Amino acid sequence: MSEQAKVGLGLRREMLDEFCDSTPDAIDFFEVAPENWMTLGGKFGRQFKQLTERKPFFCHGLSLSIGGPSPLDIQFVKDIKAFMDLHNISTYSEHLSYCSGTGHMYDLMPIPFTQEAVMHVVKRVKQVEDILERPLILENVSFYAAPGAEMTEFEFVNAVLSEADCRLLLDVNNIYVNSVNHHYDASQFLGSMPTERIAYLHIAGHYEEAEDLIVDTHGADIISPVWQLLRECYEIHGVHPTLLERDFNIPPTSELLNEIDQIHEYQHAVPSLLSRSA
């Protein structure tokens, strides 16, 4: 099997008992938000260590605030490095957004799509990478307003990736959510992403607030148009490791495995896709 044809699951604490007893073979890797696990001790800490010795892990951060106006929290980045070193984790991704300004905002805010913002992010990416001694992977995010935009979303994302020389966590559901909320063509946006910079993918469900407003919740099953966009992604960019996010309304593992199996099926549907990404 191609190293790219892997499927992962976002790990939640309530899954620890079950997965420490038996980890399904269909789950090739796990992803965690390090902020939620760095200070764990006791039973949870022991269980987490057990799983990291059994399966590969990725880290997907929540509060680096790579585009924020405040100085980077250097100690926080050092703590992330120590956590990753302890558990032998090499992959770290973060949202191309910010969550701090005057205080910490417990949400991910959009960065203005400007050249000034591009250069601001690029400088901070280099700082983070120097401390982590690892590449920083950036994720395209869902957003509900674009303040002060001087370029389009895909122009901004591409500019940051190019100037920072970093890789992309391509979130397929975020593309769909933004395409509905901001009235653009999801397939066209998907095709504008640089294949050579894609590290891995996210896919998730969302909540339809209204006909023209979708909220990225990670709390529902994946819908048909998002599945179709994932297939298109494999057809355009080749197969990449793909992570199922489910943060709320978590169903029984059997239902999560149904979606994981569906991703595996798409990854293996066209053999030429595997050879292209190998």
Curated annotation (Swiss-Prot):
Intrachain disulfide bonds: none
Coiled coil: none
Pfam name, any one: MbnB_TglH_ChrH
Transmembrane segments: none
InterPro entries xrefs: MbnB/TglH/ChrH (IPR007801), Xyl_isomerase-like_sf (IPR036237)
Protein family membership: Belongs to the UPF0276 family.
Stated name of the protein: UPF0276 protein Ssed_2857
Species the sequence originates in: Shewanella sediminis (strain HAW-EB3)
